[in-house]
Amino acid sequence: MHRFLVKLSSSSSPFSNQLRSLKNQRLILPLLPSSKPFTSSSVSPPPSPLNASNRFGYPYSADLFRNLSPLNPNSRILGVNGITSSRCISSEAVRESIEYDVLIVGAGPAGLSAAIRLKQLSQEKNIDLSVCVVEKGAEVGGHIISGNVFEPLALDELLPHWRQEHAPIEIPASSDKFWFLTKDRAFSLPSPFDNKGNYVISLSQLVRWLGGKAEELGTEIYPGFSASEVLFDASDKVVGIATKDMGISKDGSKKENFQPGVDIKGRVTLFAEGCRGSLSERIIKKYKLREEVNAQHQTYALGIKEVWEIDESKHNPGEVIHTLGWPLDPKTYGGSFLYHMNDRQVALGLVVALNYHNPFLNPYEEFQKLKHHPAIKGILEGGTVLQYGARTLNEGGFQSIPYPVFPGGAIIGCSAGFLNVPKIKGTHTAMKSGMLAAEAAFGALHEGLNMNTYWDNLRDSWVWKELYAARNYRPAFEYGLLPGLAISAMEHYVLKGKVPFTLKHGKADHEATDLARKWTPIVYPKPDGVLSFDVPTSLYRSNTNHDHDQPSHLRLRDPKIPEKVNFPEYAAPESRYCPARVYEYIEDEEGKPKLQINAQNCLHCKACDIKDPKQNIEWTVPEGGGGPAYSLM
C-alpha cells in the first residue's frame, strides 16, 4: 500500500492542538489508489517519471480535521488569542463554527503574503491577531501553476532577507529571446522584456516556502478544505465561508463517511482564490463591484504547461524564450514560453487568449503542435516530461480591476486581476495586493480605519502605476496580431505608456465564439508519444485525483443546452477548450449526441466557466483535496 506523510499546520489554537501534537508522531494515512483520467476511450498512461514522493492521494481533509477534535457537541472552545469558536447543532449532523480575526480563502502568493504581513504587523504592534488560511488543494502549492519568471520586488518588501533563508529562488534570468514563429522557422525580434534581476522559478515550490514562513509566524493553514459558500450576517455583510460537506455520493445521499462542512468566520475575510475564483465572482456580482468603478469585463487566457527534463548539453539555466505567431492563427492572441530552470528542467507553455473566434480551435492540440516546431523540438528531443498542467489567467489588466472592497473584506491577487500582460507577470503584483489588504485589515481591526484604505493605497502603489502604463497592450491585439504589435511597440518604445487614451476590450470571451458554420474544422495530427501526447497521458502527469462518488462540481444551468445549442450550433466547443477532456459527447440509446461530464479529470483551470458560449457551465468547488497535485509548476 502506498503511504504518505501528513503535513499538519503549526497552529496555536486549542482546537488545532490535536493536529499539531501529531507532528512528531509521523502520522501515516493510506493513499487511495489514484484514479485514471476517464474518457469513453481511455488509454493506460505510461509510468509516471515522478517519484512516489510527488504523488498525493486522499488529502488530510475535513475528516481528519474534525475526527481529531476533542470537543463534545455542546462545547464552546477558545480559539487563538481569545477568539471564541463554537459548534452548531442540528438533528442530522454536527457542524462546527470557528472564528478568527482574519480569514483568508486561498493559499497562493496573494493569500500567503497577506497572512505573513498580518502576522508581522501583529508582532510589530504587540497585538494578538488570529489568522486562518483555507486551501482547497491537498497541500499548499498543489494547485499552483505559473510560468514563471519571478520579479522579487514584492518579496523584497515582505521578507527582505529571503536570499539568506533558503527560498527556492536560485536561477537568475540570464538572457531574453523573443521569436516570431512560422511553421518551420523562428525569426528573432528585439525583445521587449527586461528580466535582469528576475529569476526562473517554480511558483508551486515558492508558495510552499511562503506557507512555511506564514506558519512560522503563527498563521493557521488548513489545506484540503474547499470554501463552497459565503456566509453573511443579517446586514448582508460577509462574515466568513462554509467549507464543503464531505462524503456525499453522486445521487446526493450521505455515505457512511459523511462529515458536514465547517463554518469558518472572520472579522475580515480576504478572498485570494486566484483567477475566476468561484466565491470571488459571486461577491463581485452581488455587490456590483465592477459597476462601482466602471470597470470593464475581465478577459482571460488559458495557459497549458509542461515541465521537461532535457539533455545537459541543451540546458542553459536562466535562458528565457518567448514566442508569437505559429501555431496560432493571426486573429488569435497568444504565444509560448520556454524557461530554463534548474536541474536540467525547462518549463514549456502555450498561452491562448479565450476570446478566440474559431470554435474548432483546440488549445491542447495547439500546444502539442508547438512542440514539433524545429526550434522547440531541438531542445526537447531526448528529454522526458515530468509534469503537466493548465490554468486560466486574467488578461484584462487595468481596465478590468473591480472595486476590491466589500462589506466585511476584500478581494486580492488574481481574483481581482493584477496581471501585467506585456510583462507576462502577476505574482509580484498579487503579492503586493495581499500585503496592502493585510495592512488595511489590520488598520480596520485595531486602528479605527476601514477596508477602503486598501483601495486608496493600491491606487497609490507601484502596482497601479505599472498596470496603468501597460493598460493598452492587450486590447491593442483586438485588431489582429500585426496591428497589435505595431500599436504596442509604439506605446512601449516611443510613448513609454503615456498615451492620453485608454483602449477598451472587445466582446466578452464567451461572446467572441463564432457559430461553427463560419469555420472549417481543424484536423490535428495524432500524437507521436515522444513529443506530443494524448490527453489521458498528460492528465496522469498532473497527478489529478478526485473521489468519483461525489456530485459533479461542474453544473449545467440548463441541462438541455449542450445537446440543443452547443453541439449543433457551435460544434461542441467544450470538448476542445477543456485541456482535460472533462466534456465529451457520446451517443445515447437512440444514437443521439449526449454530453458526458468526466468531472474527475478536472484540472481546476476554469476555462469552461469562462468560454462556454451560453455561460451554461458553472464551476464550483469539489470536495477538499481533489484536483491536481503540482510539485514543479
UniProtKB/Swiss-Prot annotation:
Activity modulation: Up-regulated by KIN10, by S1-bZIP specific dimers, and also by C/S1 bZIP heterodimers.
Q: Which UniProt keywords apply?
A: 4Fe-4S, Electron transport, FAD, Flavoprotein, Iron, Iron-sulfur, Membrane, Metal-binding, Mitochondrion, Mitochondrion inner membrane, Oxidoreductase, Transit peptide, Transport, Ubiquinone
Q: Name one GO cellular component term.
A: mitochondrion
Q: Subcellular location, in the record's words?
A: Mitochondrion inner membrane
Binding of [4Fe-4S] cluster, residues: 578, 602, 605, 608
**Cofactor binding summary note:** Binds 1 [4Fe-4S] cluster.
Q: Which cofactor does it need?
A: [4Fe-4S] cluster; FAD
Question: What is the transit peptide's residue range?
Answer: 1-90
Which GO terms of type biological process are on file? alternative respiration; L-leucine catabolic process; response to absence of light
Residues reported in the UniProt entry to bind a ubiquinone? 334-335
Q: Please list the reactions this protein catalyses.
A: a ubiquinone + reduced [electron-transfer flavoprotein] = a ubiquinol + oxidized [electron-transfer flavoprotein] + H(+)
Name the domain of life this protein comes from. Answer: Eukaryota
Name any one Pfam family assigned in the record: ETFQO_UQ-bd
Q: Which GO terms describe its molecular function?
A: 4 iron, 4 sulfur cluster binding; electron-transferring-flavoprotein dehydrogenase activity; metal ion binding
Q: What happens when the gene is disrupted?
A: Accelerated senescence and short siliques with reduced seed number.
Q: Is Ribosomal protein set as a keyword in this record?
A: no
* Regions that enter the bilayer but do not cross it: 140-161, 401-421
Q: Which residues form the 4Fe-4S ferredoxin-type domain?
A: 593-622
What the record says about family reads: Belongs to the ETF-QO/FixC family.
Q: What does this protein do?
A: Accepts electrons from ETF and reduces ubiquinone. May act downstream of IVD and D2HGDH in the degradation of phytol or chlorophyll during dark-induced senescence and sugar starvation.
What protein does this entry describe?
Electron transfer flavoprotein-ubiquinone oxidoreductase, mitochondrial
Organism, as annotated: Arabidopsis thaliana
Q: Lineage, please?
A: Eukaryota, Viridiplantae, Streptophyta, Embryophyta, Tracheophyta
